[in-house]
Structure formats: C-alpha cells, structure tokens
Design a protein with these regions (language model features):
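Phosphate-binding site of ATP-dependent enzymes
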Residues: 63-168, 172, 180
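ATP-grasp fold ATP-binding core
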Residues: 9, 36-62, 82-96
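Amphipathic alpha-helical regulatory segments at dimerization interfaces
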Residues: 43, 77, 191-192
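A conserved acidic, glycine/proline-rich C-terminal tail/linker
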Residues: 186-195
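Hydrophobic (often cysteine-bearing) scaffold residues that line and stabilize catalytic clefts
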Residues: 181, 185
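Conserved N-proximal alpha/beta basic substrate-recognition cap immediately N-terminal to
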Residues: 1-39, 57
C-alpha cells in the first residue's frame, strides 16, 4: 500500500516521495468522501503528477500525467482494476537503488539502470533503436512514440527509452558492493527498515 507506506515514512521523518490515496468512485459510499476530482485537479495545477495503482508493482498501471485529459485516462485505467489510486509529484529521479535488509543488515544492494541509446549526432532515435533491437540490446516493447523516433540525439547524448526504473519495464539491475555504499544511503535504509 503506497499511501500507508508514505504515511509511515512521513511520521518517522524519513524523506520520501509522498503518495496520496484517491479512492475509486465506487468506494465513496464507504469512505464518506465527496469525490476526488477537485483535489486531483488542484494537485495537477502544481505540476506533473504520477498516478499509479496504490497496490501495484512492476511499473504496471503507472502514468506520468501533465494534463486533465491524461489524468482522466490514467484514473479510468487504474480504477478498472483497483479501488485506490496513489498520486505523487513527478520527480526526475536519475538513480534508483534497492537494498534488501534482513535482521538489521544489508544483504543485497543494486541500482536500476534504465534502458537507453547513445546518440551519434547523425542517426535518428528510430534507427538507433532498430540497431539496438537487432543486436538484442534493447527490448522491442520499449519503442517511444512516433514523434520521438525522428529525433536525432547529439553525439554522446544519452537518450532514455523509459522514465520508469522498473525491471519489468526494461531496466536492468547492477549489483553493488555493500561495503562501498555511501554511509548516508546505508543509514537511511536501516532507519527505513526499522519504521
């Protein structure tokens, strides 16, 4: 439950991306709510949002939302299979880490590397992508929208194929050496595990 996890982290003073919960219209009779659209639109006015299934995993039913139409489509898709939608502010996160803690000790650490292409200053995203797919370097389900395919990234420019860091959405895991982890990260993870 993304919202409950956010509430616990907030209560413990642990920094995180806060996830608010918006119940499906079919659940309003149980929550005594008066609807969510006014609050959702107010949040959208502040900037880009991420809407996701409050109970979901793997990057499924996760949408970056910039407009009211995108918000309505995201909510419609999420509420088809979930009673609750988690909404958070979009953050341009460059690096995401996962650490597994057991009995108070970190047992596994890895970072998630999003799929990307490297520009040569001449080839379009479409051509670079076709070459990477042919070589088995990129999954074919990561094709960007048509407008993006004609872009020509500069030489050496990294072109990300997905804004999500999920392994099920094409990212790969890079195992990290536990003794080499930054102390700030280790401290934060141990505090979070205790929460």
């Amino acid at each position: 439950d993304k919202n409950i996890a956010s509430e616990v982290l907030k209560e413990e003073g642990i920094p995180s991306v806060y996830h608010a919960c918006f119940m499906a219209p079919s659940m309003l009779q149980y929550t005594g709510g008066k609807g969510s659209w006014k609050a959702l639109l107010a949040e959208l006015e502040k900037g880009t949002l991420v809407c996701k299934d409050n109970y979901g995993t793997g990057g499924n039913l996760v949408f970056k939302v910039r407009t009211q139409a995108e918000l309505e489509q995201a909510a419609s898709d999420i509420y088809k299979s979930s009673e609750a939608m988690a909404v958070c502010r979009y953050e341009d996160i460059q690096s995401e880490y996962r650490l597994v803690v057991l009995d108070g000790e970190i047992r596994l650490a890895f970072s998630k590397i999003r799929p990307s292409l490297t520009g040569d200053g001449v080839s379009t995203v479409g051509k670079l992508l076709a070459e990477a797919i042919a070589k088995g370097q990129i999954h074919s389900f990561l094709v960007p929208n048509e407008a993006e395919l004609s872009k020509v990234p500069s030489k050496g420019e990294t072109y990300l194929l997905n804004w999500k860091h999920n392994l099920g959405q094409g990212a790969s895991a890079l195992t990290l050496s536990i003794p080499d982890l930054e102390e700030e990260l280790v401290s934060l993870v141990k505090k979070t595990a205790k929460a």
